[in-house]
A protein has these predicted regions:
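Core mid-bundle transmembrane helix pairs that form the ion/substrate translocation pathway
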Residues: 16-86
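Helix-loop-helix junctions within the multi-pass membrane cores of secondary transporters/permeases
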Residues: 95, 99-173
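Transmembrane alpha-helical segments and their short flanking loops
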Residues: 72, 100, 135-136, 144, ...
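Transmembrane helix-loop junctions in multipass membrane proteins, especially transporters and channels
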Residues: 17, 25, 45-53, 87-91, ...
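Short aromatic-rich membrane-water interface segments that cap or initiate transmembrane helices
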Residues: 63-70, 107, 205-209
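Transmembrane alpha-helix interface/packing and boundary motifs in multi-pass membrane proteins
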Residues: 79-91, 105, 148-151, 184
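Conserved small/polar residues in nucleotide/adenosyl-binding loops
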Residues: 2-7, 240-244
Length: 244
């Protein structure tokens, strides 16, 4: 249902703008929300529901093929592309796939992939922190955006640090996620639940895979830092602010 809701929310914003344009201001408080919700729900069940279901099924099939047929390489690609899905909002469809995995097999291999993809963005933020020696504001932002990644929230790191001046830190983070994801696949890391990543993910990872889970996340964290520092030294400065 995640992909359907994602599509519906974007449609609702368009309908609301149109309704605000044509509905008289004196009754807009009542009728704009009513019109928006009505047309959005009609579209959800007649158009976006079936389309979103197809997208979700297609995404599930791609993930299954990548992870189970292409081994560590497939896991690398999956992990590397997961946060770009977050940027577009289509990542919500994966939650249903995780629930189905737990229901049918009792385990969730996507949890480890989720974790490394988020932790890698935190690594990217730390990489930017290290570069911002003369930019106190950027250092503060980078550090504060890194902390949420430890408990599974990547958006601050993505938008406040890794995409702020260049796409390079974000790409480096995605590559770090891929490395961590490949390790998770090789180590056979699995969880018995969903929704918890980073430090909190330790609560649901299969006990005999905890050490590998930690190692995979460390790989995902360290690789972006190294790549960002190397890129900055060889290709030029990634920061474009005046010292503060």
């Amino acid at each position: 249902m995640g992909s359907e809701m994602c599509i519906r929310d974007r449609f609702m914003s368009k309908v609301e703008k149109i309704a605000q344009k044509y509905v008289p201001a004196v009754v807009s408080f009542v009728f704009v929300p009513t019109i928006t919700i009505f047309f959005a729900n009609v579209a959800l069940f007649t158009v976006f529901g079936p389309v979103g279901n197809m997208i979700g099924n297609g995404l599930a099939a791609v993930i299954d093929v990548l992870y189970n047929s292409f081994g560590a390489f497939g896991a690398f690609v999956f992990a590397a592309l997961l946060q770009p899905l977050v940027v577009t909002g289509t990542h919500q469809a994966i939650q249903g796939i995780e629930a189905n995995l737990i229901a049918t097999t009792g385990f969730n291999y996507i949890q480890g992939i989720w974790s490394v993809s988020i932790i890698a963005q935190g690594g990217g933020a730390i990489g930017m922190y290290l570069l911002a020696k003369k930019h106190s504001k950027d250092r503060d932002i980078a550090m504060s955006s890194f902390i949420p990644t430890l408990v599974g929230i990547s958006e601050p790191a993505i938008f406040a640090a890794n995409l702020k001046y260049s796409v390079i830190p974000f790409v480096c983070s995605c590559l770090g996620a891929g490395c961590g994801g490949a390790f998770m696949k090789l180590a056979g890391v699995r969880a018995i639940g969903q929704g918890l990543t980073g430090i909190l993910g330790l609560l649901i990872v299969v006990p005999n895979k905890l050490v590998f889970y930690v190692i995979g996340n460390l790989i995902a964290f360290i690789v972006p830092i190294v790549l960002i520092v190397i890129y900055n030294k060889t290709k030029g400065c990634l920061l474009y602010t005046s010292p503060s």
